[in-house]
Amino acid sequence: METIRLTTAQALIKFLNQQYVHSDGEEFPFVEGIFNIFGHGNVLGIGHALEQDPGHLKVYQGKNEQGMAHTAIAYSKQMLRKKIYAITTSSGPGSANLVTAAATALANQIPILLLPADTYATRQPDPVLQQFEQEQSIAITTNDALQPVSRYWDRITRPEQLMSSLIRAFEVMTDPAKAGPATICISQDVEGEAFDYDVRFFEKRVHYIDRKLPSERELKGAADLIKKSKRPLLVVGGGAKYSEAREALIAFSETFNVPLTETQAGKSAVEASFKNNLGGLGITGTLAANKAAQQADLVIGIGTRFTDFATSSKTLFDFEKVKFVNINVSRMQAYKLDAFPVVADAKRTLEALVPMLEGYKSEYGDDIGQLKAEWLKERERLGKVTFDRERFEPEIKGHFTQEVMNEYADALQTEFAQTTALLTINETIDPDSVIICAAGSLPGDLQRLWHAEVPNTYHLEYGYSCMGYEVSGTLGLKLAEPNKEVYAIVGDGSFLMLHSELVTAIQYHKKINVLLFDNSGYGCINNLQMDFGGGSYFCEFRTADEKILHVDYAKVAEGYGAKSYRVSTVEELKAALEDAKKQECSTLIDIKVLPKTMTDGYDGSWWNLGVSEVSDREGIQKAYELKQEKLTRAKQY
């Protein structure tokens, strides 16, 4: 047996360079590069190995472990899970900062490789710097916190363990049904230890991502249910994007006159202008999609997890009559909602169903077009909301008085409505631009209002809805789409939570654009607490003497080296967007908007929340009673 003597870290980097993916006839490297923040736990091991020979790996220095991991997640998601970045961190706090990002990747089923350093395998210097001591077991370290948020987790305490661990990790990351974060913790002393590795371990390794075909039984069962239905409904999830099923979805929808609705993950799988596309459904859905959902007698899930936001906490559909066909590569997801499961690739399944349904037509007739036209009229109205200091009724009604709205207008020096600003952006940026969002009220506005006309240009992280993903993720978008303009659509709350990778983007001349909506508060949660009978309690950004906080975010960005703009009108926003396109550096547009001017929920948008059963507030009592009434019509599981 021929061997090569390498340190554990050198063997790791050599192996990463030899991993390839084969998908739809194309072959390419799976690992694009590696993000790092070096500390004493990884700088002398992985750091030295990369300095010595990174191979084809692109190496970037991050500014926050969670932030750079979110960059890697966004890159993989935008590349349809066909390429990844690895992440190396030091032990202790550096590793702990990966927990939130790992959970984000797991919730969204996105493959990334996490390589946190660990405590000493020999235990000779224990407790080493940044190691805590747990009395119940000396073997427990910070990295154990990553176990529940990793699809695969391992700890390397001997150099030879690396081989079986890496093979297993890549099997998991390249499996469409169970893709997610793989975490390999490497003891910091072991990173530098050498071993005589079998050279065959470093040969080119190709991971085949094949399309799983549906069985004849699955196709017949699905076709029979569709033929019996009168008002079927397509629910397009993220799996439809990863399957690149656009043409198959359009053909199926057109041939059988079936309306198409979208989850956050599925939006932009099919362009918004497609005649049968009714937009997002559920809690943050359009009026058109939710009406169609309530009338459906068969729901055909295409690569969706059917989260509470898609099903309105399992109250959106008429569960007394509706049936489900779930097409999903994941057996677990396909079995949800008592569905007839088709565990197969979305594109291939839809293509196979079309000839089996010859002669079938839904009974919608012109209803789909009428629903869409009704919604487009409402969308147009939302794009023209203007503020009035005397008689203004915001979209979120009954929360703030006119006096409070005027106070915000004065403090933020704006009369700009959020929906007007958002639709102005949609109309002004290039159609092939890619937008990203994750948390706050903006995801709801985007799912309802944003029209994506180019496939895979709408990037929402709504599996974990992690505040702070937006700016970090925009850098990931730019790495995936270097020739397109990329935009973070982010609220002030999420921006404050995490925006460190804006500096990384500036450092490496990777132009990103940050569109920062500032309403001085956690507006989404403020709506929530007040909708359910509470007061406005610690969700507005107010000073100790109750003054509204006014932050100059444009100046913050200028300090980092970005080109920045301050806007509070349609004209200023359009001018800033056009000028930002001309810039070669990263930009930030500080958009001051009024609170309560985001979209509100439409018919069918109820959300099951933990409302207090006992309260002295009448509003909370009524909210609890409504919850109990809604649950009588909800599916229990």
Swiss-Prot record:
Query: One GO molecular-function annotation for this sequence?
Result: magnesium ion binding
Looking at the UniProt entry, the stretches that span the membrane are none
Catalyzed reactions per annotation: 3D-3,5/4-trihydroxycyclohexane-1,2-dione + H2O = 5-deoxy-D-glucuronate + H(+)
InterPro entries under this entry? DHS-like_NAD/FAD-binding_dom (IPR029035), Myo_inos_IolD (IPR030817), THcHDO_hydrolase_firmi (IPR023757), THDP-binding (IPR029061), Thiamin_PyroP_enz_cen_dom (IPR012000), Thiamin_PyroP_enz_TPP-bd_dom (IPR012001), TPP-bd_CS (IPR000399), TPP_enz (IPR045229)
Matches recorded under Gene3D superfamilies: 3.40.50.970, TPP-binding domain (3.40.50.1220)
Which residues of this UniProt protein bind thiamine diphosphate? Answer: E65
Which Pfam family, an example, fits this chain? Answer: TPP_enzyme_M
Q: In which pathway does it act?
A: Polyol metabolism; myo-inositol degradation into acetyl-CoA; acetyl-CoA from myo-inositol: step 3/7
The entry's free-text remark on the cofactor is:
Binds 1 Mg(2+) ion per subunit.
Leader peptide range in chain numbering? none
Required co-factors:
Mg(2+); thiamine diphosphate
Which GO biological process entries does UniProt record here? inositol catabolic process; isoleucine biosynthetic process; L-valine biosynthetic process
| Binding residue positions for Mg(2+) | D492, N519
Key word NAD present? yes
Question: Does the keyword field hold Transmembrane?
Answer: no
Q: What is the documented function of this protein?
A: Involved in the cleavage of the C1-C2 bond of 3D-(3,5/4)-trihydroxycyclohexane-1,2-dione (THcHDO) to yield 5-deoxy-glucuronate (5DG).
**Family membership:** Belongs to the TPP enzyme family.
**What protein name does the entry list?**
3D-(3,5/4)-trihydroxycyclohexane-1,2-dione hydrolase
This chain's source organism reads Halalkalibacterium halodurans (strain ATCC BAA-125 / DSM 18197 / FERM 7344 / JCM 9153 / C-125)
